[in-house]
């Protein structure tokens, strides 16, 4: 039997198995328009009071901040302060087609994608819109690797974790449509030995699977902002274009966060205070959270003093242990056009995570997509095969570029591949990409009928031809590295935070976002951070309820003594 015929049969069989396994996941969201019901309690910061008080002030309306706010609003007054715009101002964030466009759009200081370049010289981006990076990413959704929970320093309630994932998934996670290129990718992964075949699954497991997406079957994005709709609208207020400059502290009776100072788009300062038993919760992300703590005087004492920032509390690890997962890749230009697709099929191993997507050609390079602006641009549809190093172990730090202006992005350095284990994992991952390119499934996408990885029209840096030449692969990894946009760390549990995400040494101050752990939790982290916001919100509600019961019991006991 011809190899091409056998490949076609295998493709059909794999698709059949994947479709059969769709039913194993609980009921997910259904296709709909993006739900902006929360607009009735969202305001431009210019319309907010100059001074107000709330039970909880959440800095950052992003991937964790939105579900956290919705949860706390069930019982308490909550203010969310987001530096960016409402997504309605930038409709391209609401579609799958807009993913590349948003990276192409020039950064004017207001656009949803804020550009920055690390001190490693690698282009990168961060979200600047309500919904955070969940509003600008590629939409991949997965639950966290189960092994991370035991190593996290947090005493997780796993039943609650699972219920919390479902709370998110019921609203903004979808089973992806059949996409021809993704099916080809899945078949190639399986031919290359990325086993077993898990079909459709949200769980992070070694093997090949179709994963969830926050794009529905019409290509509409659903993101963290929609989780605000699950809150109590009478208790919830969202302010956009609100740049939080500093956390306010009190020393009586102990060091306590009592509120924040923020400015609106006109430069007018506002103050938001927290009531008794309330908290300031920083959810400004891996870049924004350590930056705000440093500007507020919480960080390494000698460093803050050198910048003439009054030291509120010496915390040596704020801004330290900053990690970013490197992305290395190969682009192929097929002889015939292929349909653009988002990522829905993943290949997972212990050391690396892989995916592919296809795209239309473009004349303006998407910022941070390729390692440099001099990278050649595709003149036809192309396929992008990416490998992400798990972990990683390499880390750097964040320092302030401005000691007084929160709008000036800080300096960040990730030190990609400074740890040799990460480099070894990249080599293994790119060799697996070589095996992928050698499969029968990808033969129709060659321009010449040549063996192995040869015969493709490669855009950019090609893979080393000798799959046994580790030194050549190491050079490839260093020269082709880009960001996977999954940076994390800077305010770690066990270093800056306790196991309840409280900043140690300060009352009424927590951090709930991607800065809290030293590793990426899954093939894509957004599922974990969406869960984290809801989870910590529930734990806070439980703490408050238990505290109120203790007070009530004490009052009853005192009353009985009087009687």
Curated annotation (Swiss-Prot):
Broad class of enzyme this protein falls into: lyase
Tissues and organs where the protein is expressed, per its UniProt entry: Seeds. Localized within cotyledonary parenchyma cells.
SUPFAM superfamilies per record: FAD-linked reductases, C-terminal domain, FAD/NAD(P)-binding domain
Active-site residues, record numbering mapped to chain: 486, 524
Cellular location(s): Vacuole, Aleurone grain
Signal peptide range: 1-27
Cofactor: FAD
Ranges that cross the membrane: none
GO cellular component, one term: aleurone grain
Quaternary organization: Monomer.
Catalytic activity: (R)-mandelonitrile = benzaldehyde + hydrogen cyanide
Name of the protein this chain belongs to: (R)-mandelonitrile lyase 1
Residues engaged in binding substrate: 355, 484
Disulfide bond is among the record's keywords: yes
Disulfide bond annotation, renumbered to this chain: 426-477
InterPro entries (UniProt xref): FAD/NAD-bd_sf, GMC_Oxidoreductase-Related, GMC_OxRdtase, GMC_OxRdtase_N, GMC_OxRtase_C
Keywords: Disulfide bond, FAD, Flavoprotein, Glycoprotein, Lyase, Signal, Vacuole
Glycosylation sites: 145, 162, 379
Family label: Belongs to the GMC oxidoreductase family.
Post-translational modification: Glycosylated.
Entry-linked PROSITE patterns: GMC_OXRED_1, GMC_OXRED_2
The protein's role, per its UniProt record: Involved in cyanogenesis, the release of HCN from injured tissues. Catalyzes the stereospecific addition of HCN to a variety of aldehydes in vitro. It is a major seed constituent, and could have the additional role of a storage form for reduced nitrogen.
EC number, as in UniProt: 4.1.2.10
Pfam families referenced in this protein's UniProt entry, alphabetically: GMC_oxred_C, GMC_oxred_N
Binding positions (FAD): 63-64, 82-83, 129, 133, 137-140, 244, 485-486, 514, 525-526
One Gene Ontology term of the molecular function aspect: mandelonitrile lyase activity
Annotated organism of origin: Prunus serotina
